[in-house]
Amino acid sequence: MEPYALTIHEARQLLDKKEISSVELTRSVFDRIERVEPKVGAYITLARESALSAAAAADTRLQSGGIAPLTGIPLAVKDLICTTGLRTTCASRMLETFMPPYDATVIEKLKTQGAVITGKVNMDEFAMGSSTEHSALGSTKNPWNLACIPGGSSGGSAASVAADMCLGSLGSDTGGSIRQPASHCGVVGIKPTYGRVSRYGLVAFASSLDQIGVLAKDVTDSALLLSAISGHDPSDSTSVPREVPDYAASCEKGLSGLTIGVCREYINAEGLDPEVADTVNRSIEHMKAQGAACVEVSLPHAQYAVAAYYVIAPAEASSNLARYDGVKYGFRDPEADSLLEMYARTRSRGFGKEVQRRIIIGTYCLSSGYYDAYYRKASQVRSLIADDFKKAFETCDVIVSPVAPTPAFELGAKTEDPLTMYLSDIFTLSANLAGVPGMSVPGGFSSTGLPIGVQLIAGHFNEPALVRCAWNLEQAVNIANKKPAL
């Protein structure tokens, strides 16, 4: 096996035994990037020189015995997480040359462990999209079928992991942006509980929904990554001071004593692809065969999640993105003759169509006379959705559902139909609105060879139950070693 194809835990064993060095591992990853990146287009910025320097430092650390789980491991980072010395573009013309003056807390945590950052990966502009086609710096393709989308907005994160162009990646999830691309690219993705991972240094889209998470080749790797980036951060007022468990310790526990909930509103949803439904139902049977109990649960207000989300998220985005006006940093239109013209031209030329659309929607929802009719009502629906989850978790530990209604669709199929694109996240939005953790784990493949993920959702801070359930499902399905033919 080539070093770039290793999982994190496999690489960890070889590094600890001195059977491979971090420099050798990192060079292997960059050789792989050189071969397949022109096909996939996962990266915005490569950091070969600094990565090899970090790998050499990791090797020195390995010799001295100061080893952490991620020491010497090459990882990619979604390009809306701030990195000192490495531009952070948000896949937007507005920030195309922006160099952050500080590292995000999660980046500090990775560097403290001695991880190697390979570069910044592509995304939908400012994380607004479900296909990674809304990037000002080029679209990313699905490694399993280069004519298809990888999902979004963390499409570069998922594609880089699936294509073995890193051993793991950081992403962010505002309405499904980790779980949906993880499903489409056949990798594991975790959106943690809101407040579990610091958002300091994450460029904001919708602050009450955004959450940094991880994408990995298998469940064990995802657990290792999540443990590494979790924990309280005084720099983030929404960060929760709660002890971080060893998530990987949940991997080899059986499912006896665990209860899974089947939400019929999701399983019987209109527009659900039959192959996706079959994959979810088979996964439920796998978990029952391994000792899990199964009950039906109801999320009666889930049908309103899309409507509520597309009021709340654009409203918060319109506020967060007001800071990009061409004055302090970022793109500035050089042809404006007045301050007001500079604002208008900068924002109309610096933001793409989808970002402009959501800013306009959000501004309208917050405008005088419409706040109560839209934003307040959406916030009330959000509370009802959170209550639905609370009631469901009184009878089960983990809810099993689809991640997306269909496998990955073709590039360009939905770019001119925003409403159809928005419905791609119909099964993932509710977890963000409720602030609960969600996870996508590979469950099988479509008849055309495209990956299909299964979503697992747990109560607040019950990520160990997600990992436990996902690991057992992974063992039963036994497709973690299947790779795209690039």
From Swiss-Prot:
Cellular-component GO terms for this entry: glutamyl-tRNA(Gln) amidotransferase complex
Residues annotated as catalytic: K78 (charge relay system), S153 (charge relay system), S177 (acyl-ester intermediate)
One Pfam family cited in the UniProt record for this chain: Amidase
Catalytic activity: L-glutamyl-tRNA(Gln) + L-glutamine + ATP + H2O = L-glutaminyl-tRNA(Gln) + L-glutamate + ADP + phosphate + H(+)
Gene3D superfamilies per the UniProt record, alphabetical: Amidase signature (AS) domain (3.90.1300.10)
Superkingdom of origin: Bacteria
Family per record: Belongs to the amidase family. GatA subfamily.
Function of the protein: Allows the formation of correctly charged Gln-tRNA(Gln) through the transamidation of misacylated Glu-tRNA(Gln) in organisms which lack glutaminyl-tRNA synthetase. The reaction takes place in the presence of glutamine and ATP through an activated gamma-phospho-Glu-tRNA(Gln).
The protein's name: Glutamyl-tRNA(Gln) amidotransferase subunit A
Taxonomic source organism: Desulfosudis oleivorans (strain DSM 6200 / JCM 39069 / Hxd3) (Desulfococcus oleovorans)
